[in-house]
């Protein structure tokens, strides 16, 4: 259902791009399951047309769509078809983009790794969900060192600092690796990685 919806939504592409965990997993890392879709736009008029775009794409794939939440810059829908469902979040992005040019995979407009990792660092500061830590660990393992993206994250959110991120990383405690992870990771590996990174960031924050 996810793939059918995205394929039709971007058939005549509106000015939106896929970002977040699904974009990261489906198009870059293949590291975990992600059930929802995050579609962002920088265009206010396009955001206002969200109900039309959604209804058209859902109808063409034989799905129904129900509005779950509406806010000035956020809309959440549930798409259903034959027992399957997916949550789709539409966001009017107001934060400046580090890389305005996005990637295109099989016709689907996808956010860049630089944008996604910067947003993930911001997310750790604002909400600290385990999926964000998993994503950051797997990004680092794939060759994207987190410390290289802190400055980008700070451009998006002034509340991000090496000291704050170091503290949050040092506090991570896991009972188990979540079931949505599909690559081989152990709790020990995760905790060791974030403890080591926390120490590096602490030194960066308070050099002797």
Task: List the predicted regions and their residue ranges.
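Compositionally biased terminal segments of proteins
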Residues: 1-208
């Amino acid at each position: 259902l996810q793939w059918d919806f995205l394929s039709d939504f971007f058939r005549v592409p509106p000015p939106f791009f896929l970002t977040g965990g699904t974009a990261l997993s489906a198009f870059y890392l293949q590291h975990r399951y992600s059930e929802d879709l995050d579609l962002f736009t920088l265009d206010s008029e396009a955001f206002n047309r969200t109900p039309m775009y959604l209804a058209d794409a859902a109808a063409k794939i034989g799905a129904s769509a129900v509005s779950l939440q509406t806010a000035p810059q956020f809309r959440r829908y549930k798409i259903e078809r034959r027992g399957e469902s997916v949550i789709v979040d539409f966001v009017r992005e107001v934060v400046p983009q580090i890389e305005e040019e996005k990637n295109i995979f099989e016709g689907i407009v996808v956010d860049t790794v630089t944008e996604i990792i910067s947003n993930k660092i911001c997310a750790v500061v604002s909400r600290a969900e385990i999926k964000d830590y998993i994503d950051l660990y797997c990004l680092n393992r794939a060759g994207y060192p987190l410390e290289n993206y802190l400055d980008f994250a700070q451009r998006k959110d002034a509340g991000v600092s090496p000291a704050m991120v170091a503290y949050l990383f040092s506090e991570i405690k896991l009972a188990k690796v979540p079931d949505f992870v599909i690559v081989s990771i152990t709790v020990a590996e995760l905790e060791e990685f974030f403890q080591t990174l926390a120490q590096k960031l602490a030194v960066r924050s308070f050099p002797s």
